From Swiss-Prot:
Gene: rpsH
Entries under InterPro entries matching the protein: Ribosomal_uS8, Ribosomal_uS8_CS, Ribosomal_uS8_sf
Organism: Thermus aquaticus
Disulphide bonds in the chain: none
Gene Ontology cellular-component terms listed: ribonucleoprotein complex; ribosome
Name under which the protein is recorded: Small ribosomal subunit protein uS8
Stretch forming the signal peptide: none
Length: 138
């Protein structure tokens, strides 16, 4: 039994980008879809789509990479360099609007679950709401 499906999704994304996969699949849920909408809007992934695998709903995540590097390592640059779960089932992390972290001084994003929906750190600050700190990405 999976105790933290969000951490599982983030781990699948992290592992797939490390081996330069084109896409990866995760079991579907509305909450995961909201997180993926933010990642796509902020440019961390190309997009996602709903698919059926053996009659079960899945989300196929299309990963994004930068241009090929020069030198001895010609692999493309990873767009997602770091993706980490912060609030977990065993240790929930809630922040008020004044405690929302700035990830990499604004180069990365924090994703929060708020009363106004799933938002980035910038959107939550703009709307003046805090919430549960789901993850950080840069």
């Amino acid at each position: 039994m999976l105790t933290d499906p969000i951490a599982d999704m983030l781990t699948r994304i992290r592992n797939a980008t490390r081996v330069y996969k084109e896409s990866t699949e995760v079991p579907a849920s509305r909450f995961k879809e909201e997180i993926l909408k933010i990642l796509a809007r902020e440019g961390f992934i190309k997009g996602y789509e709903r698919v059926e695998v053996d009659g079960k709903p899945y989300l196929r995540i299309h990963l994004k990479y930068g241009p090929r590097r020069q030198g001895p390592d010609p692999r493309p640059e990873q767009v997602i360099k770091h993706i980490r779960r912060i609030s977990r089932p065993g240790r929930r992390v809630y922040v008020g609007v004044k405690e929302i972290p700035r990830v990499r001084r604004g180069l990365g994003i924090a994703i929060l679950s708020t009363p106004k929906g799933v938002l980035t750190d910038r959107e939550a600050r703009k709307l003046g709401v805090g919430g549960e700190l789901i993850c950080e990405v840069w």
